[in-house]
């Protein structure tokens, strides 16, 4: 079976992690992925090629619409794909869905990975295109969570059972707590026995780094030994956050760690995970943090479907004061980590175990 994956970029964020987690497993089951990318460079390029995937670079649809359409049609014609799987952060661009449907692809999937989007123009396009998606994809609606499904496909179709939840599953072994990794990372950055508050996320408005810094300043009043470890690629907010850290003399307490491939090691170095996002589909970062045994203090905008283990998530309203957030973070940091057996049980029961979920996705592709 050959599947064309659309929607991956060069960031290496949650969407890309979703596809690669499944690809690593499905490639062992005679399911091969190819990829269309319009961003000049795709994340995980080397690994994709190692697994046997082909990468097709196309013009950016916003800058060269006709060139995008022409190249995409060529790819579909030569590829003879069983499935075209379009991963979407919004419905602003439905061109690949339309082209795949017109080309006669047996199964064209629209997959919602988000629950909102920035910008008035994009929001307008999203709402205009929602109805068109239903005509193109018929019954092949995927979403990472209920809130993501309702946002892209609407309440009527979700309540009618037309949306399939495909979970953001992970390989537990990649994220399990390691005392050795904790010691190595803490030594490398000079953290010693300090109180490490961690966050993983691209520097975009959605992740609310401004609010995160407000909370961290209150944490310092209660735990002067605290440090903030920020893991994530540079986005539109990076320079603003960097400048604020400098202007508020927090440079020795806030660490910009960049995009990492060894996320499990950095999670092991943390004492608590802080995630005050403005909105999310279903964040991989929270599944990974829970797999490491961390207690996570999160915004209540995030779907409870991400709760792997009861009691491990501590949700708070974004309207709650930074001081109250800080109190919750400090308390959460005192809780012991969850053990391996409980984590595994939670991942399996919550449908976050990649081995099981990959088999399910293969079956969905074949239906």
Regions found by a protein language model. Give the residues of each.
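N-terminal strand-loop element at the rim of the active site
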Residues: 5-70, 234-238, 364
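A short helix/loop element that forms part of the nucleotide-sugar donor recognition site in Leloir-type
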Residues: 176-190, 243
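Short hydrophobic beta-strand element within catalytic cores of glycosyltransferases
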Residues: 35-37, 286, 295-300, 305
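A conserved mid-protein helix/loop that constitutes part of the nucleotide-sugar donor-binding site
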Residues: 13-21, 195, 199-218, 239-240
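A short, active-site helix/loop in glycosyltransferases that binds the activated sugar's phosphate group
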Residues: 136-176
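Aromatic "clamp/platform" in nucleotide-sugar-dependent glycosyltransferases that forms part
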Residues: 89, 259, 278
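Active-site donor-binding acidic/aromatic loop of nucleotide-activated sugar
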Residues: 237-240, 251-260, 266
């Amino acid at each position: 079976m050959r599947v064309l994956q659309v929607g991956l970029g060069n960031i290496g964020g949650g969407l890309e992690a979703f596809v690669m987690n499944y690809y690593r497993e499905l490639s062992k089951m005679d399911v091969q992925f190819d990829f269309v990318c319009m961003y000049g460079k795709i994340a995980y390029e080397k690994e994709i090629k190692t697994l046997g995937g082909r990468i097709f670079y196309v013009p950016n649809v916003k800058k060269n619409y006709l060139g995008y359409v022409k190249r995409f049609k060529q790819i579909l014609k030569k590829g003879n794909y069983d499935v075209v799987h379009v991963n979407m952060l919004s419905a602003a661009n439905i061109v690949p869905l339309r082209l795949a449907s017109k080309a006669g692809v047996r199964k064209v999937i629209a997959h919602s990975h988000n629950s909102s989007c920035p910008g008035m123009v994009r929001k307008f396009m999203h709402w205009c295109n929602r109805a068109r998606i239903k005509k193109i994809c018929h019954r092949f609606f995927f979403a990472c969570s209920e809130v993501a499904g309702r946002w892209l496909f609407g309440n009527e179709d979700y309540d009618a059972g037309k949306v399939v939840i495909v979970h953001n599953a992970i390989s537990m072994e990649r994220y399990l707590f390691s005392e050795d990794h904790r010691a190595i990372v803490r030594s490398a950055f000079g953290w010693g026995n300090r109180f490490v508050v961690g966050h993983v996320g691209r520097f975009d408005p959605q992740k609310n780094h401004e609010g995160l810094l407000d909370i961290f300043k209150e944490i310092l009043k209660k735990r002067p030994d605290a440090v903030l470890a920020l893991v994530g690629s540079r986005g539109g907010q990076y320079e603003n956050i960097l400048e604020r850290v400098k202007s508020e003399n927090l440079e020795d307490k806030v660490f910009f760690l960049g995009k990492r491939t060894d996320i499990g090691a950095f999670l092991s170095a943390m004492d608590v995970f802080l995630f005050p996002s403005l909105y999310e589909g279903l964040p991989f970062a929270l599944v990974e943090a829970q797999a490491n045994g961390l207690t996570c203090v999160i915004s209540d905008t995030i779907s409870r479907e991400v709760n792997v283990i009861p009691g491990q998530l501590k949700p708070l309203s974004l309207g709650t004061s930074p001081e109250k957030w800080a109190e919750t973070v400090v308390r959460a940091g005192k809780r012991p980590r969850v053990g391996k057996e409980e984590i595994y049980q939670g991942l399996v029961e919550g449908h976050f175990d990649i081995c099981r979920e990959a088999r399910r996705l293969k079956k969905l592709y074949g239906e």
